[in-house]
Amino acid sequence: MDFNAYSSEVLEWLEGVRKNRGTDAEKTLMLCKNIRDYAREQDDEKLLGYAYYYSGETYYLLNDVDKLFRNLSCSLPYLEHSRQHGLLARAYNILAITSMNRGNAPFAMDYYLNARMYCEKYKLYDIGIIININIGMLYNNFGEYRQAEKYLEQAYDLLQKNKEIPEYYSYLLNIYIGLGNSCFYQEEYMQAQEYALRAKRGVQWTSGRVRADCLCLL
């Protein structure tokens, strides 16, 4: 999304959010408030979507569920109207993760499927890999192991077409773990062992520096 047409002050706020997200929650929220206040004055949906999304993401990291839902829910129409589809898919992903953590699996699946729809429609392959992995993990939790395999294999296919992404081996490891679990719980022990060996090699490829739970991937 191109923000170059904005004033230097707004660009400074936007850059501040990018630099501080995930490391300085207080500063990120302050900058998002600046952006949001300005965007309301200007009736600017692009900036409103951006500010609400990154506020919601920050509250996710702070484990403030009410503010997370409030901000991300506000972000959805603005992100849709301003065509910020990458952030829109990520917003649905966070809503799904949080719903699952609260024990509301049906809502989680609805959010994931919305995210997946945007990824397919707008060719958001990197986010699409994450979403398919997360859906596969959710189906494993349901005990629907064939469905889990279906989505994990789709994640694998997408990943093989996008080998240049920095998270390649991290995603591959999560896929192998998910497929291994699917096979194990179906008593397909030889296949489960093969995925376990692949996962072990994956840890070696990444020297152990792996984000090993895709439900935390944003």
Residue ranges of predicted features:
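Residue signature of alpha-solenoid helical repeat architecture, marking inter-repeat boundaries
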Residues: 7-8, 46, 86, 126, ...
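Residue register of alpha-helical TPR repeats
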Residues: 11, 50, 90, 130, ...
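Amphipathic alpha-helical segments of tetratricopeptide repeats
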Residues: 33-40, 73-83, 113-123, 153-164, ...
